[in-house]
A protein has these predicted regions:
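Intrinsic low-complexity, disordered N-terminal segments enriched in polar/charged/small residues
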Residues: 1-3
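N-terminal glycine-/serine-/threonine-rich phosphate-binding loop
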Residues: 6-46
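Ligand-binding beta-strand-loop-alpha-helix segment within the catalytic cores
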Residues: 10, 14, 70-135
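Acidic/polar N-terminal loop/beta-strand segments that form early-domain functional surfaces
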Residues: 20, 49-51, 80
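Short alpha-helical
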Residues: 25, 52-56, 121
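Short, glycine/acidic-enriched capping/hinge loops at junctions between secondary-structure elements
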Residues: 30, 57-60, 88-90
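Generic structural signal for well-ordered alpha-helical scaffold segments
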Residues: 31-39, 62, 66, 99-103, ...
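Glycine-rich N-terminal segment of FAD-binding domains in flavoprotein oxidoreductases
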Residues: 40-65
Length: 135
């Protein structure tokens, strides 16, 4: 796995911890935060993660989108990482995961989806280009 982090500097940030009853409550609260940002700024940029934890959040967001309550048409996304050596068509890739669990279920412009290329010949150049695109 590789991530697009080259000239990373750390800054002090405060984190608010939110306690929830269960996974469903956590998923809905996370979806509320994301949807509020999209409503506030329809062309916002989201940083997205993979794995089992955000699936409930993605499901809730897709449900609101299907009902017409949330519009992803102007949203851009950047995924955090990708497995090196895996094609985007490989079911084990994060690219595949995101389309299967989220992007195929919302009205996002596919040109606004950004995921690292796991088959990039030059991973340093891939990460540098990704980092520049995020800026």
């Amino acid at each position: 796995m590789f991530m697009a982090m080259q000239n990373t500097s750390f800054m002090e940030v405060s984190m608010r911890i939110v306690r929830t009853r269960d996974y469903e409550d956590m998923s809905r609260k996370a979806a509320n935060v994301i949807s509020a940002q999209i409503i506030l700024k329809p062309n916002c940029i989201l940083g997205l993660a993979t794995g089992s934890t955000p699936i409930g959040t993605y499901t809730q967001l897709a449900e609101w989108n299907k009902k017409g309550d949330l519009d992803f048409s102007q949203v851009s996304t950047y995924n955090l990482d990708e497995y090196r050596g895996l094609s985007h068509e490989d079911p084990q890739s994060y690219h595949y995961f995101m389309f299967d669990n989220f992007f195929n279920h919302i009205d996002i412009n596919k040109n606004n989806i950004h995921i690292l290329n796991g088959l990039a010949k030059d991973t340093e150049a891939e990460c540098a280009a990704y980092e520049k695109a995020i800026e």
